[in-house]
Curated annotation (Swiss-Prot):
Residue ranges of coiled coil: none
Domain of life, source organism: Eukaryota
Biological process terms in GO annotation: mitochondrial electron transport, ubiquinol to cytochrome c
CDD domains in the record: cytochrome_b_C (cd00290), Cytochrome_b_N (cd00284)
Source organism of this protein record: Microtus abbreviatus (Insular vole)
Binding site for a ubiquinone: H201
Protein name in UniProt: Cytochrome b
A Pfam family reported for this protein in Swiss-Prot or TrEMBL: Cytochrome_B
Entry binding sites for heme b b562: H83, H182
Single GO MF annotation: metal ion binding
Protein's gene: MT-CYB
Oligomer and partners: The cytochrome bc1 complex contains 11 subunits: 3 respiratory subunits (MT-CYB, CYC1 and UQCRFS1), 2 core proteins (UQCRC1 and UQCRC2) and 6 low-molecular weight proteins (UQCRH/QCR6, UQCRB/QCR7, UQCRQ/QCR8, UQCR10/QCR9, UQCR11/QCR10 and a cleavage product of UQCRFS1). This cytochrome bc1 complex then forms a dimer.
UniProt record similarity statement: Belongs to the cytochrome b family.
Length: 380
């Protein structure tokens, strides 16, 4: 078996990635989320494939086909709710994975980090298009509002929006193409994940100290395969509790009403995992400014390697920046809450304050805190 594992052209790639991979001896449970994201991706592709067998991407029948899946298809209700709540689990793992990267300075592995940002954009695009497919009220109006933001692009904006819509409004052509893109993107994401891993294995994993761990490595299997398996069990338990006991808790009741272009819902809002970005978008009164802020809210992650001023990599031994980090986490939670609230006083001013704080913490306060910590170290 050892000979096949190490000599076979295909199996040796798997061996070097998941079995004989040298891993730091001290990586904590925060390093479990990579494997959990892989599990989420596989789950989403499988459940999505079975849903696609019964779904019809036509405005006249899309809503009915989802109802048919839930009522008439064997375990269709389970597949549908696993797919819908699987997206939420995917984003929970994604946010924790990115948060871990920011905390422990993993952004210094620039190729891996940038590929991660591309993956984040791809997953967000996929989730957005997936939300349109059931063709409920929030699907239709969410698609209308978000795609319409592209009209803020000078000169080509209106043409671009009509090109994406395939007409003069969100209609049959839009739904069909969104289904096509929603189907193909997860496979593109899978390819990007392999590139992400390729870049990661060029440098090796970071660790909680942020120090070089070349002198203290252990094989990935059995140590981290067992550790990852525990994470998988915990995730599956949380996932099945969510899916079987509270399947609609994260959804919007408006999406149980078929799409009606003549009736606007009182509060148009995206799924919970986009609310922080939606709050940043709404906090700027100018349309183009809002769109730029929306894109920058994610793209700012790409600036992190440039904004790193500390002599230390991780925040493990940096109490001032640690404080800034947890204020940033709290700020993101506030933005998520604001994104789900109506556009009225006092939510407008809270959203604007939280949006300014978000960019200020990342661009100004954390780099300054890093320099202060450097000076404190020099004093010693």
């Amino acid at each position: 078996m050892t000979i096949i594992r190490k000599k076979h052209p295909l199996i040796k790639i798997i061996n070097h990635s998941f079995i004989d991979l040298p891993a730091p001896s001290n990586i904590s449970s925060w390093w479990n989320f990579g494997s959990l994201l892989g599990l989420c991706l596989v789950t989403q592709i499988l459940t999505g494939l079975f849903l696609a067998m019964h779904y019809t991407s036509d405005t006249a029948t899309a809503f009915s086909s989802v109802a048919h899946i839930c009522r008439d298809v064997n375990y269709g209700w389970l597949i549908r709710y696993m797919h819908a709540n699987g997206a939420s689990m995917f984003f929970i793992c994604l946010f924790l994975h990115v948060g871990r990267g920011v905390y422990y300075g993993s952004y210094n592995m620039i190729e891996t980090w940038n590929m991660g940002i591309i993956l984040l954009f791809a997953v967000m695009a996929t989730a957005f298009m997936g939300y349109v497919l059931p063709w409920g009220q929030m699907s239709f109006w969410g698609a209308t509002v978000i795609t319409n933001l592209l009209s803020a692009i000078p000169y080509i904006g209106t043409t671009l929006v009509e090109w994406i819509w395939g007409g003069f409004s969100v209609d049959k052509a839009t739904l069909t193409r969104f289904f096509a893109f929603h189907f193909i993107l997860p496979f593109i994401i899978t390819a990007l994940v392999l590139v992400h891993l390729l870049f990661l294995h060029e440098t090796g994993s970071n660790n909680p100290t942020g120090l070089n761990s070349d002198s203290d490595k252990i094989p990935f299997h059995p140590y981290y395969t067992i550790k990852d398996f525990l994470g998988v069990l915990i995730l599956l338990m949380a996932f099945m509790i969510l899916t079987l006991f509270f399947p609609d808790i994260l959804g919007d009741p408006d999406n149980y009403t078929p799409a009606n272009p003549l009736n606007t819902p009182p509060h148009i809002k995206p799924e919970w995992y986009f609310l922080f970005a939606y709050a940043i978008l709404r906090s700027i009164p100018n349309k183009l400014g809002g769109v730029l802020a929306l894109i920058l809210s994610i793209l700012i992650l790409a600036l992190m390697p440039l904004l790193h001023t500390s002599k230390q990599r991780a925040l493990t031994f940096r109490p001032i920046t640690q404080t800034m980090y947890w204020v940033l986490v709290a700020d993101l939670l506030i933005l998520t809450w604001i994104g789900g609230q109506p556009v009225e006083y006092p939510f407008i001013i809270i959203g604007q304050t939280a949006s300014i704080a978000y960019f200020a913490i990342i661009v100004i306060l954390m780099p300054i805190a890093g320099m202060i910590e450097n000076n404190i170290l020099d004093l010693d």
